[in-house]
UniProtKB/Swiss-Prot annotation:
<dbReference type="InterPro" id="IPR004821">
    <property type="entry name" value="Cyt_trans-like"/>
</dbReference>
<comment type="similarity">
    <text>Belongs to the NadD family.</text>
</comment>
<comment type="function">
    <text>Catalyzes the reversible adenylation of nicotinate mononucleotide (NaMN) to nicotinic acid adenine dinucleotide (NaAD).</text>
</comment>
<dbReference type="GO" id="GO:0004515">
    <property type="term" value="F:nicotinate-nucleotide adenylyltransferase activity"/>
</dbReference>
<keyword id="KW-0662">Pyridine nucleotide biosynthesis</keyword>
<comment type="pathway">
    <text>Cofactor biosynthesis; NAD(+) biosynthesis; deamido-NAD(+) from nicotinate D-ribonucleotide: step 1/1.</text>
</comment>
<dbReference type="InterPro" id="IPR005248">
    <property type="entry name" value="NadD/NMNAT"/>
</dbReference>
<keyword id="KW-0520">NAD</keyword>
<keyword id="KW-0067">ATP-binding</keyword>
<dbReference type="GO" id="GO:0009435">
    <property type="term" value="P:NAD biosynthetic process"/>
</dbReference>
<keyword id="KW-0808">Transferase</keyword>
<keyword id="KW-0547">Nucleotide-binding</keyword>
<dbReference type="Pfam" id="PF01467">
    <property type="entry name" value="CTP_transf_like"/>
</dbReference>
<protein>
    <recommendedName>
        <fullName>Probable nicotinate-nucleotide adenylyltransferase</fullName>
        <ecNumber>2.7.7.18</ecNumber>
    </recommendedName>
</protein>
<dbReference type="InterPro" id="IPR014729">
    <property type="entry name" value="Rossmann-like_a/b/a_fold"/>
</dbReference>
<dbReference type="GO" id="GO:0005524">
    <property type="term" value="F:ATP binding"/>
</dbReference>
<keyword id="KW-0548">Nucleotidyltransferase</keyword>
Amino acid sequence: MTSPILTGIFGGSFDPPHEGHSGILKSFFREVPDCREIFLIPNRQNPLKGEKFSSSENILEMLNLFVSEFSETIRILDLELNHPGPSYTIETIQKLKTLHPNREFVLLIGEDNYSNFHKWRNYEKILDEVRKVFVFRRFSEVVPRNSKLFSQFQFLKNPLIPASSTDLRQSFFQSTIPDRIPKKVLDYILRNRLYSK
């Protein structure tokens, strides 16, 4: 019997993708060497956050430019972008398991999502559906909760890169060209006047 292919799930707005995302992916592939592939899943509307700024087409194009700099296998899936209304992780995971029955999944989330994971729809069911949840640090060391519920969580040793899509968009809104965006992505943003007033 063939072993299932271990695959990471990394969702987010990616509006725009930036060097923080790069550091996270590099740390993940380094610390989880048996993971064969990552599915990048941009969301149309996060139920705990606001609306997106860029069109689905622009986000997919930025992500294609972003992943072109990686040698590892990263696949971009648009199933949440095409989903009307908010996207829920449990529904996405269950859909992926139906579409890819030969794969076993792990989930990749940020420390902010770790802190409010109990607010996610059917969060306990999510832990039943994936082998492990990897948490990347954004601002500081995080002390894991001493709870059976959170025994499946593992923290990555990713570099703390002070970059967020929200802050980068704000820089563009203020007519400042930010750093921490890969050159190909930045060129696309400027050429298409994304995030311009």
